[in-house]
Amino acid sequence: MSEKTIALLGQPNSGKSTLFNGLTGSRQHVGNWPGKTVERKDGSFVHKGTTYKIIDLPGTYSLSANSDEEVVTRNYIASGQADVVCILADASQLNRSLFMLADYAGIRVPVVLLLNMMDVAKSQGKQIDTDGIAKSLGVPVVPLVAADKKEYGEFFRMLESVDKTASVLKENQLAQVYHSSIGTAFDEIKSLLPADGIGIYSSTWLTAKLMEQDKSACSLVKENVDASTYAAVE
């Protein structure tokens, strides 16, 4: 029997834990992340001969390393242990929920966007163009009602083809946003970094984090460029 690992990411109250519980039932374990007081939840389920291990990562609003929850989430994503990262967004508050995606653009891991609470969005009279969102972001988009297991059909169909369909979020729009809001300083710093980025992090994402003075990103860059380049970055 083959095995795959899914990481669940999302803002607090995105329905992430509801989906986790719906998929795993009693097949779950709760503990702490090593060296942290942050709760770790993992579980598993079987679908069409494949065992899926699910990691319910802490609810966060970004991947900046400003809290233990954010550090845990970012380190796990960077570890490459997940075969696919499922990001949950609240379909009833789509603009607000999609804002967090900017922080995942530029991190080169396979991503699927799960639009949860589609029933609420529908009751509000909202029509969501999932195909249009998928085309814009460059990743699969799956409508979902995490509180209703009968609505998991499209999620399971996504799993069956995830090896072929999951892809990295497009970062070109992220770069444009930073360039328009920050100006030439963004481009100047980006030009000092390795063109291919560092590890799973693109140069665009690293530049954004450097400008936020993200301590972990600063340390990573310092370890991977020469002293004169890092001095110029500072």
Report each predicted region and the residues it spans:
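Conserved G1/Walker A P-loop phosphate-binding module
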Residues: 1-63, 80
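Conserved C-terminal guanine-recognition region of P-loop GTPase G domains, centered on the G4
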Residues: 43-48, 72-140
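Canonical P-loop GTPase G-domain recognition
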Residues: 121-174
